Amino acid sequence: GERPQGCEYCWKIEDMNTHAVSDRVYKSRIYPIEALDEAFRTPNSADVNLRTLEISFDRTCQFACSYCNPAFSSTWARDIRTNGPYTGLVSDGRNHFTHPHDHSQLYKFGETNPYVEAFFQWWESDLHRTLQELRITGGEPLMSGYTWQLIDWFKQNQGRSNTRLAINSNLGYDDARLQEFIEAIRPLPHVEVYTSCEATWAQAEYIRDGLDYHQWYDNVQQLIESGAIKALHVMCTINALCLSSLNKFLDHLVALKALYGRNAVSFTLNILRFPSFQSPLVLPEDIRALYRGRLQAWYAQNETNEFLHEHELRHVQRLIDYLAHVQSPHSEAFDMPKLRNDFRQFYTQYDQRRGKDFRHTFPQLTDWY
């Protein structure tokens, strides 16, 4: 068979060793084997109903995470408009950090938006009957009026749709706003929340600009305790800066599992490839080895932990293997000296724009940085 370039992420994982499991397996496990067989046998010209759909209404977001960009965050776009482009980044071939990407959001909420109108027409006509899962991403979905419009539809049309609603959220809200969300979704038949974090305290707040870690952790607990959601999933974007406290962050997640149950919260470790200068692979080998050793110790300590799912342990193990065996984030990545130069260029400017201090927040990287 062939290896299309778009499949490179999974092949890098599977090439590490014969036991490595890539996302093409995890992304398929939500479907029964019968559905996968049916998809294999069905001609590509056939008219089929979608089973899952992921939609982004707009890019409105109060965060400006370091690994994000203006195409997905209005706060990032404001940074570029206010402070101008990031300069000196030779590996930013797609110009993620040079302009506000206004083409990513052509219409404001309330304006005539043919794309959103088409979605709601489709949803009302038959999608609400045939779709198994609708996942809303962003931006920050809870800052989009269209997300609340969809929640209102479910409340006003109870019993008409069995579609599972999955909502991405950074959970960066005060108690009043969080309670408003909880009460809004309580009548809905099936809601799951996906949230993101991959480090602890000041390091998490540095990476995910706009985050209050204490507030985030408290909101996670309130959501679980509310009983309004079926599950909460934590997506960890594995980048160069999170590794120093990732093991502690995983401890925090295990503590939640012990408190609320094995299935109340789950996590995945998703290895960052873009922007490639923020990949964990830009770190020098001695630092990678240090972090790899910490993860190995964490794995050994938790391998028989009753609260961990097999896929969670496998995600930790594949990250350990990735740090040991993979040398480049992807096939089009620049050579390592250029990526490391961009790393320093970016975070120097990031500190100036966001009022942060890399050396103070990541003292273990200071000598290398």
Residue ranges and their predicted role:
Residues 58, 77-80, 185-188, 196-369:
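Radical SAM enzyme [4Fe-4S]-AdoMet core and its adjacent flexible, acidic
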Residues 50-60, 71-115, 129-147, 157-177, ...:
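Core AdoMet radical
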Residues 6, 119-122, 150, 216-219, ...:
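Alpha-helical packing segments of well-folded alpha/beta enzyme cores
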Residues 1-109, 127-128, 315-369:
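N-terminal pre-core extensions flanking Radical SAM catalytic domains
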Residues 148-152, 176-184, 245-247:
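Distinct, well-ordered alpha-helical segments
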Residues 116-119, 124-125, 283-285:
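General structural signal for secondary-structure boundaries
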Residues 121-127, 152-158, 182-186:
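Leucine-rich repeat
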